[in-house]
């Protein structure tokens, strides 16, 4: 059996996912694509999925008889409408982050999915499938460092586009830490503060960069997350967790060590594509496998998308107020209690 996938949005990550569905993963086939830029959609189909039909819009693609599952990789503000339409059609949907740009939008998706009665949505929080983060999770579960006390994270990008704004440091970038850290710590967020250090000369006038986000969990763990999207030297993701009995850190991505011209060192990756390539493969294979087995979606859920959105809203409020803001979430519905399975491969 094959899961026939329709892809909405054929930009950077849409193309990447189409390529992996067609060339790397098993049990899937891209049968449909669409993009508001129809020339791009045609070009991408022609390059990576010659058999795919190019549709004029998301609604036509979702309705297509040869589309079993939908992959949403359009711009964030377009996600909610596509996910809701896919749910209405009773089709599985993998949605890149953010699930929706507002907490209310995420809640509408949660409600639609619960009304449908089966989990169909997986959110593209790929770090939960990254071997390094899985090793951290395992170490915490085995209590190798005892109770976690403090976390230090770094999320650096080489440079940001002109369209990247100060709030996007939260909604577009920190959102990955927001998701992965509460999953790692098995804890909930309580408060947040955002500090603005001296601004880099490499950021455009409208952008505050870097930023320091201080999150406190209900158990009292303090997380210090640096977001620096014009760091210039590379794509750098770090995470260190200090516990009562020791410290664990995210492993470096293995790379050849080169000694040449009087220097010794390794290449620094330049973007998310290579850093999380294996994680994207595993998350999407999990989505396809759930479809092949006709089982409820088991990856990061619509509820996880909602938690991330509520937390991001509080972070943006803290950016604006300069004060500590609280993060309040309703109780997780029973429908989502047994979600977000951890893949076994570490
Ligand atoms: N999980 C991850 O690490 C990453 C996730 N993303 C997420 O993936 C999404 C796409 O990001 P990129 O590929 O970098 O952006 P992009 O700008 O390269 O591509 C987005 C594409 O969506 C199309 N589009 C916009 N609205 C549309 C609509 N209503 N219907 C159909 N097509 C539409 C655009 O024309 C564009 O071609 C974003 O939500 C982003 O946050 C992006 C990069 C990495
Ligand atoms: O999701 C991603 C991008 O959309 C975002 O713009 C980057 O800052 C992140 O590093 C990347 O993982």
Curated annotation (Swiss-Prot):
Broad class of enzyme this protein falls into: oxidoreductase
Pfam name, any one: GFO_IDH_MocA_C
EC numbers on record: 1.1.1.18, 1.1.1.369
Pathway: Polyol metabolism; myo-inositol degradation into acetyl-CoA; acetyl-CoA from myo-inositol: step 1/7
Chain spans, region Disordered: 322-346
Catalytic reaction(s) noted: myo-inositol + NAD(+) = scyllo-inosose + NADH + H(+); 1D-chiro-inositol + NAD(+) = scyllo-inosine + NADH + H(+)
UniProtKB keywords: NAD, Oxidoreductase
Keyword match NAD: yes
Domain of life the protein comes from: Bacteria
Keyword set includes Transcription: no
GO terms for biological process, alphabetical: inositol catabolic process
GO molecular function: inositol 2-dehydrogenase (NAD+) activity; nucleotide binding
Comp. bias (Basic and acidic residues): 322-331
Family: Belongs to the Gfo/Idh/MocA family.
Function: Involved in the oxidation of myo-inositol (MI) and D-chiro-inositol (DCI) to 2-keto-myo-inositol (2KMI or 2-inosose) and 1-keto-D-chiro-inositol (1KDCI), respectively.
Summary of subunit composition and partner proteins: Homotetramer.
Name of the protein described by the UniProt record: Inositol 2-dehydrogenase/D-chiro-inositol 3-dehydrogenase
